[in-house]
Amino acid sequence: MSDIKERLDKVHVLIQKSDFLEGKGLSNEVNIRIFCYDHEDEMIVRHFVNQLETDQSLECHLKVCNLYKTFLAICDDMDITDAIPDMEGADGSAYLLQELNFSIGNRQFVEKIQYAPHEQGDVLMLTGVGEVFPFIRMHALLEALQPYFSDIPVLVMYPGEFDGHHLKLFNRLKPNDYYRAFDRIE
């Protein structure tokens, strides 16, 4: 894997290219790209995303969605945020995870992430993938997002590996099948 900063520079260039923005060369596949990185580079990636968000010279409309912040917003909407620590203390982490996974699913994430209208030049960048684990699984969320974001590119900042068929979070966890992403960004 090449140097993380060099790879992020390539992302900066890529998201502004008309072929990327228009989904050219994808053979009618969805325009979902995965940028894989070592989880130890998380702070470098976060800094890069923060810089992109304030870059007035970008030739695209970057829409950054931190999935962990989205998760917290969903918890706030459900008025359960304050109860979570007590629930974990009383019933344990496994029970809390089970209850949250039952209560908060892909539908809630899609509803929170969705915006309209999508405009030409929009790029949805998903961040916070490692932070939101284990409350949501990326392969399942991407499947759920596809019908709502088929007209704009989606770029996932992924702390792990994607080999074109399997997503493996943190380069350690059991891989999950995901076949629809077009490619990973080297």
Where are these regions (language model features)?
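N-terminal, charge-rich interaction modules
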Residues: 3-81
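A short, acidic, amphipathic alpha-helical segment used as a generic capping/interface helix at domain edges
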Residues: 17, 105-117, 138
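Glycine-rich, aromatic-bearing surface loops/beta-hairpins
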Residues: 137-186
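Short acidic, S/G/P-rich loop/turn micro-motifs used as interaction or catalytic elements
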Residues: 40-44, 70-71, 99-106, 130-134, ...
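Surface-exposed peri-terminal alpha-helical interaction modules
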Residues: 90-94, 123, 149, 164-165
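Conserved P-loop NTPase "ATPase switch" module shared by AAA+ and STAND
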Residues: 119-135
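Long, charge-dense
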Residues: 62-110
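Extended, basic/helix-rich recognition subdomains
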Residues: 31-33, 37, 41-44, 48, ...
